[in-house]
Amino acid sequence: MRRANLLILISLIAAPAVAQRINIPAEVTDEAALPRVMPRFAKAVIAFQQADQSPDPASLSRAQLVAGLYSDALASLGKLRAPLVNDPSPRVRARYLEYVLYARSRLTAIKTKTAFQGAYRETFHALISPLDNKTSALAVNHLSFDNLSQASQALEQDLAELKGKCAISPAESFKLISDYNEREVYRAFGSTSAELIAEDDARRYIIQKDVMAAMPDGGSICALIVRPRDRPKLPALLQFTIYYDQVTLLRDARRSASNDYVGVIGLVRGKGCSRGEIVPYEHDGADAAKLVDWIAAQPWSDGKIGMFGGSYSGFTPWAAAKQHPQALKSIMVGAPVAPGIDVPMEGNVVWNFIYPWPFYTTTNKALNDEVYYDRARWAKLDHDWYASGRPYRDLEKIDGTPNPIFDRWISHPAYDAYWHSMIPYKEEFSRISIPVLQTAGYYYGGPGAAVYYLSQHVKYRPDAEHYLIIGPYDHLMAQRGTANPDGDVDTISGYTIDAAAKIDLTEVRYRWFDYTLKGGAKPAILADKINYEVTGANVWKHAPSLAAMATEAARYFLSADLAGFPDDAYRLGTAATAAAIPLSVDLAERRDVDAQTPGGGVQDKALDSSNGLVFVSEPLAKATEMSGLFSGHLEFTANKSDFDFQVSLYELSPAGDYFQLAPYWSRTSYVQDLSRRNLLVPGRRESLDFRSSRLMSRQLQAGSRLVAVLSIVKEPGREINYGTGKEVIDESTSDATTPLQITWFGGSYLDLPVHR
């Protein structure tokens, strides 16, 4: 055994630096052998790190924990925590405490020759109990036994990827050690953590679970309430949600209470302890408003309530605001959905990924993880539906399980009265006088419907106190920021996030409500109504409106001239040309059902031009900032009554990297009016004017080119429009007897928002 360990150490130290590979024992993939193999491997990695002139102290401390070198680990953790303990951010102050707690407990157990659990209790009381509420609320999140499942899954994935390998990179080694350490820490804490956290909570807070809040119609809402013990009356912060995860929701309510608010979680009817049918969206506004009234009448309430949440829980504050409850004084939402606008469809084109969601949220009192995360089932559904060419309405028949909620949604393809009833509509926005803060991201599901809500609010109420924070975030980061327990998320889908964009939006939440409910200072980041990070420039900018993000529009025409780079691309030019460009798409073709889509990253070496045309500009003479919403004018003839199209914008850097800017897609018949379908006349020259609802902000490099991909939506993950003019959900490949033929005319252009 010692000889094997020595050989590993020798191979590590003697290996050429350029190789940067660390040998791993074959037993590392054997779960039963891990307690014996991993400490030995960790010591080898420590030797590797010590040969480095600047070892990463966080990685080193984890390796020391796995190796059983607890005193060394505490020394490393002490160096990590020394500059953090007096930081103004409680998130920073709480960093690495779980590892300190684990190492101290192990040392105490060894020195006193007692069981770990007893040492853990003693160390918890010594380390966690003295913390202030804000820091402890974050620290205990990292001690929960509920984290074990996620840690175990991460380790299982690591081990699966190691099969057949005899050496791995330093990064892979550190990840393996970190994930193994994480699992062992949570295994050791076990159920004792829950007992200790409950004791600590009872000392700091009054927690009421499964509170039945009576509604005027005889129904009830299930609520969780957490309030500080030493404060008789406080403003309340309400999150009204369909996502009933007891652990996560208690953390949110505790976090609010730690910031001197009453934290209230309200669940939609039928969830948790309440009775009734679970119906997403349709009744949430009225119920949330009544819950606001109920909270205001409680003896611990000072009568002022704020609402917050993200995604679905970002929709509910808007739904409540539609009802104008008197006690609702402020809202903050992240990547909020707007039913009928961005879910279950965007641009009136339905997304398949929404299909499993009703099963996830409505089939039990909590959440149906087993069904929702059955990725093989949903991938097969997409594949089989697309390959079959059957109508979109047949998704539930192909899946084999009725999905009445999804069926009801897709039966409303226009933004009609069904959707209007759920959130403010047109002039109803004019009556929303409370302050609003929205947070959003540029990428994937990051925008939510934030731009829609903002645009409508300021259109109908120009003096609205409505702020937006937006940066290089996806759906989750748009709600929380880049903060994670050990620091910040560094990348998003291949793109390295600017340092300036690394912010904790949850901290902003409490500063926002301090400002709007307690008369505190406005958060510094809200220097103007629109607050946006310019990617690539590493700077935040501020503007009074969306339009003011740009100083001019740069017009680029879709030219029939070849660009010469890449080979099959057309020119994105600054002058109109007379020539037209044909595009033919066989909507019945299914040989691409198993095709791997190229590109897709925020920063990538490829892009997807399937069923479309690529347009490329000349290199930019100098660095150029593009910030705001892009728009376009398309002139064309088509041989069908309708089609779904997409425009995707990219920066192509001199190094050959594609950077996402912004996409736009829509059903042609709804571009003019989301609420009313306007079909094309086949063969007649038509024109469309559109504006994106997704913001972009990027500093493009000198020498970069602009790339626009104009394509037809035809893929396994979205509804397919076959162009007959009848209801799209009833169309099939039998309606695609002839390919879609479009002629794009030279008068077509894109207006891109430039700031000089």
What do the predicted segments below correspond to?
Residues 132-185, 196-199, 322-324, 330-430:
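Accessory cap/linker subdomain of secreted extracellular hydrolases
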Residues 191-232, 620-622:
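N-terminal cap/lid segment of alpha/beta-hydrolase-fold proteins
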Residues 227-296, 481-493, 609, 641, ...:
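Cap/lid segment of the alpha/beta-hydrolase catalytic domain
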Residues 299-312:
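Alpha/beta-hydrolase fold nucleophile elbow
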Residues 308, 315-380, 442, 461-510:
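A catalytic-pocket lid/entrance helix-loop region that shapes and gates access to the active site
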Residues 390, 483-756:
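C-terminal, loop-rich substrate-recognition/catalytic regions characterized by aromatic stacking residues
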Residues 432, 438-440:
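Short beta-strand/loop motif that positions the catalytic acidic residue
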Residues 448-467:
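Active-site-adjacent alpha-helix of alpha/beta-hydrolase-fold enzymes
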